[in-house]
Amino acid sequence: MGVSDDDRIAAAQSYIDGLVTHNGDAVPFAPGCIRIEQGIKTGLTGNHLRRSLNRGPQYRVIAATTKPEYTINGDEVRAVYNVLTKASLGGRRVAARVDEAFVIPAAADKATIQHIRVRFHPFAQRI
């Protein structure tokens, strides 16, 4: 049957929304989903990632994201967007340009996130 590109993008968007709302309950993680951030494994399982979104202090500083630009290549859904934090100093807010790749197989019965790989580049944004 397969999963549509729109459903795969919606699964990735639910993760990005969870970063801002600090609620990972609606994110369709596969049980064995892992997350690699800047080359380091930071997510061990789907449940671990969900708990991190719900209660992790590392996500509490996130205030908003910009609308992601999505591209799809095979089973990979790539999202490029900015994360805006609550942290600011001297009229500038800490932000980061994020390039995140989600493995969400097209041939599956439903859109579930199998793997996340993220790279980000911090910058200061005028408020």
Give, region by region, the residue ranges found by the protein language model.
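C-terminal and inter-domain tail/linker signature
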Residues: 1-127
